[in-house]
Design a protein with these regions (language model features):
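N-proximal low-complexity "stem/linker" segments adjacent to membrane-targeting elements
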Residues: 1-28
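Active-site nucleotide-sugar/metal-binding loop of Leloir-type enzymes
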Residues: 78-95
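Cell-envelope/extracellular polymer assembly enzymes that use nucleotide-activated donors
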Residues: 5-7, 35, 177
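Acidic donor-binding loop at a coil-to-helix junction in glycosyltransferase catalytic cores
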Residues: 171-178
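Conserved nucleotide-sugar donor-binding
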Residues: 149-164
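Short beta-strand-to-loop acidic/aromatic patch adjacent to the donor-nucleotide binding site
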Residues: 92-104
């Protein structure tokens, strides 16, 4: 049996303080993505340069530069992500992840996440527990385990295609809207708190 393939899409705007940690975290995974498209949404800091350096050493990383929308709303990020989704649309993959540019996780994160999907055929959207580092202290952001934080949503391709991806909503809530649509199609959504 072949190992499932996954792709990641990240929207990044002026993330030079965090993007290297995220790149390191993904590049250290026990199961690497088939492709990771990082959409630089008009970054004016060193974000693009940092991604380019990592892409030289890791061919699965691709930088996609786009013009930043003049409109400043939650939907600007969704527009950037949609351009990344279009970039991977013709690739062969089984899962797609939406990953924020300031996230780090354990080296077996995606391996363990894929195991959950393998064991649960109706699992449509899943992710791990989000923790925030504040003044050197790790603070868990516990939420309803039947919901998944938008920063780490990982979807079965069939579920992603049925939901139509992230809707552009002016005042936010795109991740929740995608989850609700997934549930309406009979998919389960789940946060696995042991995944960090």
């Amino acid at each position: 049996m072949t190992r499932p393939r996954y792709v990641l899409v990240t929207a990044a705007y002026n993330e030079e303080r965090h993007i290297a940690d995220t790149l390191r975290s993904v590049a250290s995974q026990s199961v690497l993505p088939h492709r990771w498209v990082i959409v630089s949404d008009g970054s004016t800091d060193r974000t693009d340069d940092i991604v380019i350096e990592w892409a030289k050493r890791h061919p699965f990383i691709e930088l996609l530069r786009v013009q930043r929308s003049a409109e400043h709303s939650f939907s600007a990020k969704v527009r950037a992500l949609r351009q990344g989704f279009a970039r991977v649309a013709d690739l062969e993959y089984d899962f797609i992840g939406v990953l924020d540019a300031d996230i780090s996780f354990e080296p077996d994160y995606f391996q363990r996440l894929l195991e959950h999907f393998s064991n649960e055929p109706r699992l449509g959207i899943a992710g791990g527990n989000i923790q925030q580092l504040v003044d050197g202290v790790v603070i868990p952001r516990i939420k309803d385990l039947s919901s998944v934080a938008g920063a780490v949503q990982f979807l079965r391709r069939e579920c992603f295609e049925q939901t139509g991806g992230l809707p552009a909503l002016r005042y936010g809530g795109e991740d929740a809207a995608m989850e609700i649509t997934a549930r309406m199609h009979g998919w389960r959504t789940q946060t696995f708190p042991e995944l960090k």
